[in-house]
């Protein structure tokens, strides 16, 4: 959570991008709720259709969605279909060889700088940030774009 809060501050200070930070205590419960609602809607086609908790909470959000997890990307991806727009997931896929949490998060690209890059990339895909500026962002944040993919170690 600290990395996400740090990323939100960088987005605000350096790029004038406001970020709302949400915390997920259980992706499993969000998924279970959404699947239960989906099943109910399937079995009750002539009833008013229900919305999952996640869909209700995010329905009026107009920004981009980035999930950063110390678990594999599949965890936030497991609820992505109930987001109103594309979810950009960051996670710790692969095998880490790091001596500290800070180094581990950098290795797996789930630290503040990678969260900032993910958010700005998602905004660029929606035409809300200049794609031509992304290389400058990568340099400014000190990200090595040619680093080996941590999933391949």
Regions found by a protein language model. Name each.
Residues 1-153:
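Thiamine diphosphate
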């Amino acid at each position: 959570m600290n990395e996400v809060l740090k990323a939100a501050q960088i987005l605000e200070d350096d790029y004038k991008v406001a970020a709302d930070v949400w915390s997920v205590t259980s992706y499993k419960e969000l998924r279970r709720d959404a699947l239960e609602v989906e099943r109910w809607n399937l079995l009750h086609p002539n009833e008013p259709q229900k919305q999952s908790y996640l869909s209700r909470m995010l329905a009026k959000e107009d920004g981009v969605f980035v999930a950063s997890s110390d678990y594999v990307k599949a965890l936030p991806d497991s609820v992505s279909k109930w987001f109103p727009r594309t979810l950009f997931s960051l996670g710790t896929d692969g095998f880490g060889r790091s001596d500290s949490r800070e180094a581990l998060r950098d290795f797996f690209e789930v630290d503040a700088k990678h969260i900032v890059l993910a958010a700005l990339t998602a905004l660029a895909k929606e035409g809300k940030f200049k794609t031509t500026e992304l290389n400058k962002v990568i340099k400014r944040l000190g990200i090595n774009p040619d680093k080996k993919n941590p999933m391949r170690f």
